């Protein structure tokens, strides 16, 4: 008997130790979960993730989270083969579409020809145009932007173009139109950017600016068929919660839910769990990354993990025998590490169903995130194209 509903929850940026190729990214020593645990000195309480095996899959347990003996599910880690360490790379690879050619990055800012086109289209001047922390850039330039109506253009170590503007100065819909236009400028072949991100903010002055939930990602369209496309073609339902819709440009998705926050995202998961469908629900919870990882805030990161863990308890309670849950991440963003960028890490893989035959077994280190998608496809009798399925290990047959 295969599983009727498969739920995947991506804890955005919750890595579990430096990947084998971390040196290429200058990320040796990164360990998001490990360093958050160290910061909490034993006070990080994750009972539900713990009983699923979040410490079992690590070489050393997370401080405060004992190894489960036995774990109620199966556990392992996944390595990324994509060229980058952005959300897009990670999610696409999970769905059988690893990004093997590095996308364009802009350590010195965007070329003048792109800036000129943005200024001409928007009728607004562009300022900053260099790598910057998103919270620091509005602190340093937000008041000026309010006075002048300019566009704050910045990037990071990833293949992203970010445009920030105060919502009272440039309405959100106008900012989206500018970002949609920017998307057309960097779809290749000369420049290929993974994501254009609209970054609206509010507040009276630099000490009180906050970025709003009206953030919107304009992703590169998937450059090939994904496992979600394959599931839909086979007649299964595909539901996206959070920025899944943005990451895949709406492709391969029947219904999408926009999240205001992690807790709002878990409300959506609870809502979807009440629905009768046959297929796949793919959820991204971005607060770990956006609110705490980039800001190098281990305290907030740990609290977000504990808040998620509480909500996870309800998901486990509500699961039907023919439901399958997989929890993972798309990359790391170690709040105890240097810089403000993502970190190249292995990601956790936690798998649970009330009816699984062999809980408490290690799934090992998977050699690509695509193993996750391949497993979902095999469950639904669809031929996997990329990755090695671990369906037989986790099945209820």
Swiss-Prot record:
GO molecular function: magnesium ion binding; manganese ion binding; phosphopentomutase activity
Cofactor(s) this protein requires: Mn(2+)
GO CC annotations on file: cytosol
GO terms classed as biological process: 2-deoxyribose 1-phosphate catabolic process; 5-phosphoribose 1-diphosphate biosynthetic process; metabolic compound salvage; nucleotide metabolic process
Co-factor note (free text): Binds 2 manganese ions.
Keywords attached to this entry: Cytoplasm, Isomerase, Manganese, Metal-binding
Residues involved in Mn(2+) 1 binding: 12, 330-331
Gene3D superfamilies for the chain: Alkaline Phosphatase, subunit A, Phosphopentomutase
Principal location: cytoplasm
Catalytic activity reported: 2-deoxy-alpha-D-ribose 1-phosphate = 2-deoxy-D-ribose 5-phosphate; alpha-D-ribose 1-phosphate = D-ribose 5-phosphate
Pathway: Carbohydrate degradation; 2-deoxy-D-ribose 1-phosphate degradation; D-glyceraldehyde 3-phosphate and acetaldehyde from 2-deoxy-alpha-D-ribose 1-phosphate: step 1/2
Binding positions for Mn(2+) 2 per the UniProt entry: 289, 294, 342
EC number of this enzyme: 5.4.2.7
Places the protein is found: Cytoplasm
Job description of the protein: Isomerase that catalyzes the conversion of deoxy-ribose 1-phosphate (dRib-1-P) and ribose 1-phosphate (Rib-1-P) to deoxy-ribose 5-phosphate (dRib-5-P) and ribose 5-phosphate (Rib-5-P), respectively.
NCBIfam families per UniProt: deoB, PRK05362.1
Family named by the database record: Belongs to the phosphopentomutase family.
Name of this chain's protein: Phosphopentomutase
Species of provenance: Limosilactobacillus reuteri (strain DSM 20016)
Organism taxonomic ancestry: Bacteria, Bacillati, Bacillota, Bacilli, Lactobacillales
């Amino acid at each position: 008997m295969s599983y009727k509903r498969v739920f995947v929850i991506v804890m955005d940026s919750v890595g579990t130790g430096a990947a084998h190729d971390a040196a290429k990214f200058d990320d040796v020593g990164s360990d998001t979960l490990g360093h958050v645990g160290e910061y909490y000195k034993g006070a990080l309480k994750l009972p539900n993730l713990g009983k699923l095996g979040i410490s079992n899959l690590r070489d050393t347990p997370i401080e405060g989270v004992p190894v489960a003996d036995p774990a109620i599910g199966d556990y392992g880690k996944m390595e990324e083969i994509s060229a980058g360490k952005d959300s897009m790379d990670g999610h696409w690879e999970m769905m059988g579409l690893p990004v093997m050619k590095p996308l364009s990055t802009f350590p010195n800012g965007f070329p003048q020809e792109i800036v000129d086109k943005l200024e001409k289209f928007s009728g607004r001047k562009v300022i900053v145009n260099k790598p910057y922390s998103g919270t620091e850039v509005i602190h340093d330039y937000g008041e000026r932007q309010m006075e002048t109506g300019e566009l704050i253009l910045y990037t990071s170590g990833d293949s992203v173009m970010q445009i920030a503007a105060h919502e009272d100065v440039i309405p959100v819909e106008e900012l989206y139109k500018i970002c949609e236009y920017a998307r057309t400028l960097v779809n290749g072949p000369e420049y290929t950017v993974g994501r254009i991100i609209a970054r609206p903010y509010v507040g009276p002055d630099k000490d009180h600016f906050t970025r709003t939930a009206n953030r919107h990602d304009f992703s590169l369209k998937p450059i090939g068929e994904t496992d979600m496309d394959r599931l839909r073609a086979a007649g299964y339902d595909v539901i996206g919660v959070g920025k899944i819709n943005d990451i895949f440009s709406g492709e391969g998705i029947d219904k999408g839910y926009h999240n205001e926050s992690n807790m709002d995202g878990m409300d959506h998961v609870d809502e979807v769990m009440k629905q009768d469908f046959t297929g796949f629900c793919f959820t991204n919870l971005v607060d770990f990354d956006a609110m705490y990882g980039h800001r190098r805030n281990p305290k907030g990161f740990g609290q977000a993990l504990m808040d998620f863990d509480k909500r996870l308890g309800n998901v486990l309670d509500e699961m039907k025998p023919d439901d399958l849950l997989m929890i993972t991440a798309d990359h790391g963003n170690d709040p105890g590490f240097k810089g403000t960028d993502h970190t190249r890490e292995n990601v956790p893989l936690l798998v649970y169903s009330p009816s699984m035959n062999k809980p408490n077994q290690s799934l090992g280190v998977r050699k690509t995130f695509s193993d996750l998608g391949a497993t979902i496809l095999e469950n639904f009798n669809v031929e996997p194209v990329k990755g090695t399925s671990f369906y037989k290990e986790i099945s209820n047959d």
